[in-house]
C-alpha cells in the first residue's frame, strides 16, 4: 500500500484520533464479523487516510530503525498525515514523545511482515527474537 509524501505522525493512532476512534475501530475490527483485526490502509468517512498494523505482542514500547520509541496502548502502530490530525488532546510535542514525526519526501509503502512493521524506510520490530538474545548473553 502506498501513502502519499508528507509529514506524518508514526505511532499508536489512539493518541491522535480520539475524535474518530470508534470509527477507526469499526474499520479495523469490522462489527458482526469473526475477523480478529484488519490491517493496512483505511479511509475515514471524511476522507482522511491512515494506515494501521497490529503489533505482535500488543501493548508496550517498540523501538524503530530511526531510534524512536513508540508507546502502544491499542495494540497497533500506524501513520497519518499531521495535517489530518484534528484531535488536540495531545500536543505535537507529546505525540513526538509517544511516537515519531517523520517527513516522507516521496510516496512510501506500508506493510507488516510477521511483526515487522514497515513505513517506507522506517522499520519497527514488534516481534523481536528473544531466543537469539538469550543465546548471546
Can you annotate each of these PLM segments?
Residues 1-137:
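Intrinsically disordered, low-complexity acidic regions enriched in Pro/Ser/Thr
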Amino acid at each position: 500500500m502506498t501513502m502519499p509524501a508528507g509529514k506524518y505522525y508514526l505511532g499508536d493512532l489512539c493518541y491522535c484520533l480520539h475524535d474518530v476512534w470508534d470509527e477507526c475501530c469499526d474499520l479495523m475490527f469490522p462489527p458482526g464479523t469473526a475477523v480478529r483485526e484488519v490491517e493496512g490502509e483505511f479511509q475515514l468517512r471524511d476522507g482522511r487516510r491512515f494506515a494501521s498494523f497490529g503489533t505482535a505482542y500488543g501493548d508496550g514500547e517498540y523501538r524503530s530503525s530511526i531510534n524512536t520509541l513508540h508507546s502502544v496502548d491499542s495494540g497497533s502502530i500506524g501513520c497519518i498525515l499531521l495535517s489530518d490530525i484534528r484531535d488536540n488532546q495531545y500536543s505535537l510535542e507529546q505525540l513526538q514523545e509517544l511516537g515519531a514525526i517523520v517527513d516522507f519526501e516521496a510516496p512510501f509503502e506500508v506493510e507488516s511482515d510477521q511483526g515487522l512493521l514497515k513505513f517506507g524506510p522506517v522499520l519497527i520490530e514488534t516481534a523481536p527474537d528473544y531466543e537469539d538474545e538469550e543465546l548471546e548473553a
